Amino acid sequence: MSNLHKFKAYFGMVPLDDYEDEYVEEPDQARRAPRRSHDGYAERDDREFVEPAFSKASYAPSRRDEEDAEFDRYDSRPRVDTVPSRSSRPAMAPRPASRGNLAVDARAERPEARRAPVVDDGGPLAKITTLRPQSYAEARTIGERFRDGTPVIMDLVDMSNADAKRLVDFAAGLAFALRGSFDKVATKVFLLSPADIDVSAEERRRIAETGFYSQK
């Protein structure tokens, strides 16, 4: 069949019986041929690709393996408890127990230096200066005597209450600043004591009884 006749038969220009397609059977043959070929490959695959038996590779033990084996042998050894050796140095004798274990207690046990008493053996109230200020302007004199380390008795009887209160406030601040003491011994009579002077209650009573005669 010529190509022209095939073309006419394809588009319905000639009867279909006259059209002989040489390719009708070829697709079936083409489909069957790969199937047979595939079956052959399957047989060859089953026959040729057999899983080989892998043999265990042999290698020389490394340094780490030897160390691990050494640790295993160490763990299997019997354990021996060691007794700590006693020191040849003699033990220190314990110190006598005090009131506590703090360092504050040790310092507290030290003897404190007592401040010199106001009244000494040379004479009663020999170290005291008695001042009877008339106004607040005399506060400077009181401060200078107290700063020099001399106990000062302030007799404020002749002052007004307002000025006396101002002078008492000044003396109290002065004693606090110089770490001294400020005590009342009688009505409107006060004692300023420096830091190194210790005034007891008995001495304050004696100061009040003497009438503050030791004036300077």
Curated annotation (Swiss-Prot):
GO CC aspect terms: cytoplasm
Biological processes, Gene Ontology terms: division septum assembly; FtsZ-dependent cytokinesis
InterPro entries the UniProt entry points to: Cell_div_SepF (IPR023052), Cell_div_SepF/SepF-rel (IPR007561), SepF-like_sf (IPR038594)
Location(s) in or outside the cell: Cytoplasm
Keyword terms of this UniProt record: Cell cycle, Cell division, Cytoplasm, Septation
Bias type Basic and acidic residues, positions: 28-50, 62-80, 106-118
HAMAP family, per the entry: SepF
Record's subunit section: Homodimer. Interacts with FtsZ.
Entry similarity comment: Belongs to the SepF family.
Described purpose of this protein according to its UniProt entry: Cell division protein that is part of the divisome complex and is recruited early to the Z-ring. Probably stimulates Z-ring formation, perhaps through the cross-linking of FtsZ protofilaments. Its function overlaps with FtsA.
Protein's recorded name: Cell division protein SepF
GN (gene name): sepF
